[in-house]
Regions:
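Mg2+-dependent phosphoryl-transfer enzymes with acidic/Ser/Thr/Gly-rich catalytic loops
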Residues: 5-7, 13, 45, 181, ...
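Conserved acidic, metal-coordinating active-site core of Asp-based
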Residues: 90-92, 98-226
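Residue-level signal for inorganic ion chemistry
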Residues: 23, 34, 58, 163, ...
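Active-site phosphate-binding/coordination module
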Residues: 14-124, 128
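Short active-site oxyanion
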Residues: 27-31, 51-52, 162, 221-222, ...
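Asp-based phosphoryl-transfer active-site loop
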Residues: 1-9, 83
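Short, well-ordered alpha-helical microsegments
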Residues: 38-42, 172-174, 206, 232-233
Length: 280
């Protein structure tokens, strides 16, 4: 979504909406695949009348068109403790995503994360606006404050799905990413240079997309996927027609068969229509 389907204002353009509807009218299944939690992903979608399945939290949660949860992959206690030990040792700030919300120990440090997200989406990052957004999340309960992340596992029914770590020291982030990647049960990706998105190894966009394709009896070679960042690579590498946004990272462009326009200029819609027009 961010950097791909959404523009800098976190909106889905009419061109993108119309292209998705056109694809659906041809019997094509369109799936949202995002690092966002469902309650974040569904907000911009609510401004449209689109009905689609969702791959959320990089594949940690899959929902059908009616929002029913079809599959989840969470981090067990041992993995959570290993992640926390590494991040705490390196003094790297992180948020914990669960099946019910996002947890923070220090909302003042969340500002850095959301400024980074804004920059990644092509915004300069209005500090006061982002502060207001953080407060809104706290007020509506999607961003929850805890004294200690250990308290989360004591809450009945709470499952830890993803850890989002952030640090402006890119060398440190890269080093930590390599250390975490060495843990076989973890998948480590990123949605910008300054962050790490840590999930269970079963929770990857590519794995979730393959599962959906198999359920629909669709060959992955007949699937098109679009993305802009490293958390899209597992998906783009699996499909027959990988598409990179013009604003994508070089590593993403390197594996694409097509480079479409930017997220600011409805690159998703343009790519969909290009492929469907060529098929005619």
């Amino acid at each position: 979504m961010d950097g791909t389907l959404l523009n800098a204002a976190h909106e889905i353009s009419e061109e993108n909406i119309n292209a998705i509807k056109y694809a659906q009218s041809k019997g094509i299944t369109v799936v949202i695949a995002t690092g966002r939690a469902f309650y974040e992903a569904s907000t911009p979608m609510a401004e449209t009348d689109l009905k689609v399945p969702y791959i959320c939290l990089n594949g940690a949660e899959v929902r059908d068109e009616s929002f029913n949860i079809m599959n989840t992959s969470h981090l067990n206690h041992e993995l959570v403790e290993r992640i926390k030990a590494i991040l705490d040792r390196e003094d790297v700030y992180y948020q914990v995503y669960t099946n019910r919300g996002i947890y923070t120990e220090d909302p003042t440090r969340d500002l850095d994360i959301y400024l980074d997200i804004a920059r990644n989406a092509g915004q300069q990052g209005d500090v006061e606006k982002i502060k207001a957004g953080i407060q809104k999340r706290i007020d509506n309960g999607t961003l929850k404050i805890v004294d200690n992340y250990k308290d989360i596992e004591d809450i009945p029914g709470e499952l830890i799905m993803k850890v989002l770590a952030f640090n402006p020291d890119l060398e440190k982030i890269e080093r930590i990413g390599k250390e975490l990647s060495a843990i076989s049960s973890l998948a480590v990706s990123s949605s910008s240079r300054g962050n790490l998105e840590i999930t269970h190894s079963d929770a990857q966009k590519g794995i979730a997309l393959e599962t959906i394709a198999n359920q629909l009896h669709i060959d992955l070679q007949d699937v098109m996927a679009l993305g802009d960042n490293l958390n899209d690579v597992s998906m783009l590498e699996r499909v027959g027609y990988p598409v990179a946004m013009d604003n994508a990272m070089p590593e993403v462009k390197a594996i694409a068969k097509l480079i479409t326009d930017t997220n600011e200029h409805s690159g998703v819609g343009k790519a969909i229509m290009k492929v469907l027009t060529e098929e005619k």
